[in-house]
């Protein structure tokens, strides 16, 4: 099921989606992720998953951990081996505040639940993405500056970052891809290209196929 409504803002689209298709699990949030890809020296021909850049404005630690779990599943569906970084303006205690504590707590909850996933937090963007910086700021991090699933502390940070990557970093941004609904439903930015529409349509079709396969198991 693919939903694209011209000239509607995201709030209107999401309101319609959530009215028609309920959450998969009442305990888990409905969130979103973006798939970022393109030629970039930091990506090394690999894509990134960014979350949540489109739905939840200010998730608490429990919700942030759930968003990360949903994003891991999305990354795996895209063929990635997820390496999750919980992002902050602090790296491993370099700053102290309630905002930093939220990110650190979310990481700890996620790590306890997803024992087989390589992850770390709280980390600054460069400590999560640049190996040479990680050696200084997060020497013992299992990510070693090679994260490919980036979990942002709130919607403002996530949305600003994906658009910066898209326009300044010249990466392709696919999404928001909705996570946590009973049926596959996705949205597109009003500034999307024809290629964006094609790719999101293909992703949504794959999500439908995945659900059908699970029904048959």
Model-derived regions: residue spans:
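Anion-binding alpha/beta catalytic cores of soluble intermediary-metabolism enzymes, centered on
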Residues: 1-217
């Amino acid at each position: 099921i693919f939903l694209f409504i011209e000239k509607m803002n995201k709030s209107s689209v999401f309101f319609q989606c959530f009215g028609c298709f309920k959450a998969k699990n009442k305990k888990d949030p409905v969130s979103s992720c973006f798939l970022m890809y393109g030629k970039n020296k930091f990506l090394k021909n690999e894509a990134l998953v960014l979350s949540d850049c489109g739905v939840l404005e200010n998730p608490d630690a429990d919700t942030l951990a759930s968003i990360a779990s949903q994003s891991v599943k999305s990354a795996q569906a895209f063929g990635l081996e997820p390496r999750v970084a919980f992002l902050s303006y602090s790296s491993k205690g370099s700053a102290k505040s309630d905002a930093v504590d939220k990110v650190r707590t979310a990481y700890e909850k996620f790590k306890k639940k997803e024992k087989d996933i390589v992850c770390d937090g709280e980390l600054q963007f460069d400590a999560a993405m640049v190996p040479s910086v990680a050696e200084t700021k997060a020497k013992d991090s299992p990510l070693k500056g090679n994260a490919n699933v980036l979990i942002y502390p709130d919607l403002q940070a996530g949305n600003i970052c994906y658009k910066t990557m898209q326009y300044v970093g010249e990466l392709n941004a696919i999404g928001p891809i909705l996570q946590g609904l009973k049926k596959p439903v996705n949205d597109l930015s009003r500034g999307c290209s024809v290629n964006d529409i094609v790719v999101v349509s293909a992703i949504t079709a794959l999500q439908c196929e995945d659900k059908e396969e699970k029904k048959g198991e």
